[in-house]
Amino acid sequence: MAEIPTSSNPSDDPETQKLNGNEEDYDHHHDEDPESDDENYEYALQIAEMLPFPMVMKTAIELDLLGIIATAGPDRQLSAAEIAAALPAAGNPDAPAMLDRMLYLLATYSVVTCTAVDGGASGGVVRKYGLAPVAKYFVSNEDGVSLGALISLNQGQAFLASWSKLKEAVLEGGIPFNKVHGMDVFHYQGTDPRFNEIFNKAMYDQSTYIIKKIVRRYKGFENIQRLVDVGGGLGHTLRVITSNYPSIKGINFDLPHVIQHAPTIPGVEHVGGDMFESIPNGDAIFMKCILHDWSDEHCLKILKNCYKALPRKGKVIVVEMNMIEEPQTTPLAKAISQLDVCMMTQSPGGKERTRREFQTLAEAAGFAEFNPVCHVAGFWVMEFLK
């Protein structure tokens, strides 16, 4: 019979240590860094309970909570009761308390600031909330745009439902969005007017913010006479570019059903067509957030058509985020990775690419030179030179 080992000193027994009140010694004996272990567990808790943050952000956008605070004036802070008073009358006496808890959560993510003041005769404290620096991107600016629509899109039912099919897609193949809705996201837009409205607003708002920064920083539009915007939508990007460079003749190229709704823009001609078939000729071709929608095979078709449409020394100006080859933990690295997984889940073959992958595509399409020019608000402006 095997002999059961015993300790010559009963106090060495872990259970005895606990019973004798030496639990701290017991923990240190079995865990050399209990503080680090606690921090890791706390981080794990944050991950396990992370869903409320994006959903509270979505609700804050829908209720315009940040806009209400902004309207109060620069550096002003409002209590939840004051914010609730600015909402449409809903008849809910608990609204201030609910808003306080939601805004408290946003304060932990540095979306809003918070100052606790003495509640006076009511006892306790009253928390007042202001806008943290990041909040301005979720409040409509002078152009009427913000990232709020992007939150409404990503947290909307059409996209949220797709995530339920991610496991199935990993095991069996396919695109989660298509599995839920029976079609890809681009065709789905034609069946759901509300989704189409939110999608277009999200793309328009982000594009407006980015292109205005690009025209201030990127000097490659100089000396271009004819610029083709592939996938240009309603032509807003060319409106901004040509207003800054009046000598440019803009060709806004998109699908016919998109172009038919495009407004008249001085200096811009709207042309309907299919980028997989052919692309109008120009001195330069502009593509912002087009390649990330498609697989490498589809991107090569697009880029080869661009190559055919350009003169010698012509260029394609590509604006895309660049994945970093080794994961980092910066806000931008997380944003790009999150977008990449969104593309995997929602888009037919779309993905975010590394700079090396963009260079490989450029060379495979026949371009002689790949030139990353400048970094603008998370996006790279890259030139593919013929």
From Swiss-Prot:
Q: What class of enzyme is it?
A: transferase
Catalytic activity reads: dopamine + S-adenosyl-L-methionine = 4-methoxytyramine + S-adenosyl-L-homocysteine + H(+); 3,4-dihydroxy-5-methoxyphenethylamine + S-adenosyl-L-methionine = 3-hydroxy-4,5-dimethoxyphenethylamine + S-adenosyl-L-homocysteine + H(+); 3-hydroxy-4,5-dimethoxyphenethylamine + S-adenosyl-L-methionine = mescaline + S-adenosyl-L-homocysteine + H(+); 4-hydroxy-3,5-dimethoxyphenethylamine + S-adenosyl-L-methionine = mescaline + S-adenosyl-L-homocysteine + H(+)
Q: How is it used?
A: An heterologous biosynthetic pathway of mescaline is reconstructed in Nicotiana benthamiana plants and yeast cells expressing Lophophora williamsii genes TyDC2, CYP76AD131, OMT1 and OMT11, thus providing a sustainable production of phenylethylamine-derivated natural products.
Mutagenesis / variant outcome for changing residue 292 to A:
Reduced activity toward 3,4-dihydroxy-5-methoxyphenethylamine. Lost activity toward 3,4-dihydroxy-5-methoxyphenethylamine
Residues annotated as binding S-adenosyl-L-homocysteine: 207, 231, 254, 274, 288
Query: So what EC number does this one have?
Result: 2.1.1.-
Pathway(s) per entry: Aromatic compound metabolism; Alkaloid biosynthesis
Q: Which residues does S-adenosyl-L-methionine bind? A: 254
Task: Describe its assembly.
Answer: Homodimer.
Give the similarity note.
Answer: Belongs to the class I-like SAM-binding methyltransferase superfamily. Cation-independent O-methyltransferase family.
Q: What is this protein called?
A: O-methyltransferase 11
